[in-house]
Amino acid sequence: MLIQFTVENHRSIKNSAVISFAASKDKSFDEYLLRPDEKKTLLPVLAIYGANAAGKSNVLHAMMTMKEMVVGNAAKVSKGQKLPWEPFGGTKVPTSFEMVFIFQGVRYTYGFSFDAKKIYKEYLYHWPNGREALIFSRENGVYEFRENVNEQVTLSNRTPDNKLYLVSSNDWNLPQTENAYRWFMEKLTFLMDEEPATSETVAQIVSGDDKKARILKELMLADLGITDVTIKNTSGKIPVITTTHRIINEDGTTEYFQLLMEQESVGTQHFFACIGGWLQALENGALLVVDEIEDSLHPLLTRRLIEMVQDKAVNTKGAQLIFTTHDAMLLDLNFFRRDQIWFAEKNDETCATELYSLASFSPRKGENVRKGYLQGRFGAIPFIGGDA
């Protein structure tokens, strides 16, 4: 489970910005809360609102870049190869990422600073017995270790300046860093691109009857009129996806007809693309990161997807969700807690993205926060009109 994410100097984000799943003292919807241990209570869902170009998607992009550098293509760098550095406004200072998370009952803090050429700083801490303990740290090429020192010194000497030590240690199956690496690999998932998302749904349908049945159940609950889905040419790059629909005639007889997925509505295609990854995240207890959750979906379908994560009867493994949205219908204190709603706003003077929670405004219980948001009380909306 993710506790918090911090990013500094990435795209439109200049200064350190923190988004936190730690629950406040708000007592509303206590049944939503995740409790990984006796002391910690975490939120299952966070929503980020903001005007176009305010930078809310850049928060999620920073999370995705961090994962890419740990377990993705950017982790496979060779010596001298450039890193995916996208600083604010062309500044020359390093970018920093940090994740605080819980994996297998242990809290970890992992972060690093980098530019296009090298890793300047990297560190990993854990709390195995409730106390902070260093696993490794690295700053300007100088490493510090607490266990298996000789082995890790040898490994650090083989780690080029532009490669994360967490990646190198995983390459060499170092047990001290295995769990942190596994969290990025297994528990951090993204629905940022339609094609990979669709691939996940297709993979689940062809993997077995149980997963296909679960997907069909959700498609039917969504009232899309789909009774079956078939996949052909799964060995090729582009599978042929066919949906089956049922018609009940006036005389009571039943007929079936089929459509190619590309003949379905855009909303149906988007829901189909999402649902496989959604169910997989719930099954794995993963964090799901989604940009523009409402894209082409009916508001009730969007709400259904969120409810699946909020409802502990469905979300039995402690999955979490963070998403960006413009859907003001979700701004409802009868649906979300105050600490679940966040805003991204671009500073008028610096053009840098700033993040803050609705909880910082202390709205009253039952207050119409949707109306307050659209009236500009909480910021993070476009300024329309005025002098050109």
Enumerate the predicted regions with their spans.
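Glycine-centered tight beta-turn/hairpin loop motif at sheet-sheet or coil-to-beta transitions
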Residues: 12, 103-107, 129
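Conserved P-loop NTP-binding catalytic core
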Residues: 36-47, 51, 60-119
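Conserved ABC ATPase signature
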Residues: 45-49, 234-279, 283, 287-300
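Conserved catalytic network of the ASCE P-loop NTPase/AAA+ motor domain
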Residues: 91-92, 103-105, 279-282, 311-317, ...
